[in-house]
Amino acid sequence: LLPTSHAAVRGRIDHWLEQAGIRPTVAGEFEDSALLKTFGASGMGLFPATEWVRQDLLSRYGVHRLAPCEGVTERFFAIGTERKVRHPLVQRLLRPPLHDSLAPVTVPL
């Protein structure tokens, strides 16, 4: 199970699979990551997910990580109007690197 080719991370996943010598049989491609996870949790196949959702996947779906995709990262951009962000995960995402306050957050898969 993979994100569609429209997803920015898909090219990096395809490159990683090629470098690892893995030629998967793609059972489905998904625009929506929640739908991808739901199909994966139902036993339809393996799927990539960011490290940040690992514990949620285990507790919500009983899904375990098979292996990390070394070198594959996903970038997130957060845009908000609220001056004081209260949600802890959003606070973590918005915490800028010391050298660039406009840099996106990069998360390993």
Per-range role (PLM):
Residues 8-9, 64-106:
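A late-sequence structural motif
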Residues 6-64:
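Hydrophobic hinge/microswitch elements
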Residues 4, 50-53, 69, 82:
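Short secondary-structure boundary segments
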